[in-house]
From Swiss-Prot:
GO terms for molecular function: holo-[acyl-carrier-protein] synthase activity; magnesium ion binding. It comes from the Eukaryota. This is 4'-phosphopantetheinyl transferase NpgA. Pfam families: AASDHPPT_N, ACPS. GO terms for cellular component: cytosol. It comes from Emericella nidulans (strain FGSC A4 / ATCC 38163 / CBS 112.46 / NRRL 194 / M139) (Aspergillus nidulans). PANTHER family: L-AMINOADIPATE-SEMIALDEHYDE DEHYDROGENASE-PHOSPHOPANTETHEINYL TRANSFERASE, PHOSPHOPANTETHEINE TRANSFERASE. Keywords: Transferase. It catalyses: apo-[ACP] + CoA = holo-[ACP] + adenosine 3',5'-bisphosphate + H(+). Changing residue 217 to R: In cfwA2; abolishes penicillin biosynthesis. One of its GO terms (biological process) is lysine biosynthetic process via aminoadipic acid. Its EC number is 2.7.8.7. Belongs to the P-Pant transferase superfamily.
Amino acid sequence: MVQDTSSASTSPILTRWYIDTRPLTASTAALPLLETLQPADQISVQKYYHLKDKHMSLASNLLKYLFVHRNCRIPWSSIVISRTPDPHRRPCYIPPSGSQEDSFKDGYTGINVEFNVSHQASMVAIAGTAFTPNSGGDSKLKPEVGIDITCVNERQGRNGEERSLESLRQYIDIFSEVFSTAEMANIRRLDGVSSSSLSADRLVDYGYRLFYTYWALKEAYIKMTGEALLAPWLRELEFSNVVAPAAVAESGDSAGDFGEPYTGVRTTLYKNLVEDVRIEVAALGGDYLFATAARGGGIGASSRPGGGPDGSGIRSQDPWRPFKKLDIERDIQPCATGVCNCLS
């Protein structure tokens, strides 16, 4: 059974789960547990044409339901995933009203959740935390979480495109409205690696990994704020000291094949150092990068092992839990079908 969830009576925890839908898509056209979702969510899954996209949408919904179910102790059938107002339309969970509480078998616990999801190239992930809403209304205490997945080989083989440093530089130019001049220059000169130590092919591979590392970091940060690519300050958000995480040999371990997260990123906004956000990026296997960003709620910069920027607040255990690979049948089906013990 899935663990790594927090409650109002425990220290904050940043839970991170993911589902690899590639085996599902390769083995069946079925949509397992689709019938356990709300009708609107079932429709949203089935609207996709390609099976792999249906499976990613299904996995995204199942992860959101599971996270709410386990943290808020809400019956699966009562879970309704909402969205924040326009223009952002970010998935969220709105706690029930008092009248709704009475209809729940065990009652609403008063716990709310903050979460964010990402999906790319058949990989789906959620990062989130539980918290008790602050009666004082101080938004600075509310946690904010962002997560993003990139696939470093996403463009490989597209339309016969040559994979070279020159094609990478041309590709980077498309994103001049996303990255700052300094970030574009850092990617072009392959920051973080010695060009004399790698072959031409490996330099190209590193260049693409570096680009997608920057992309994942930027997406995770702006998704944390709720702005996404609509943020007017996108180019003013700058990352430096960025190193692309190396590919990780895939062992077939059911726990996943994550490398050591890279935590040395320096973040500035309008040239000012951002000190309240914790951000990191890690490689999964050879193709994927997962970036996570968080602030507030005891899971921001001060939650780093050893404390915050001033070295204070040492914790006995890192509240950021490692990514955990979930299996739909083993980990989610008991909760979705009402045979788990989560509410007891």
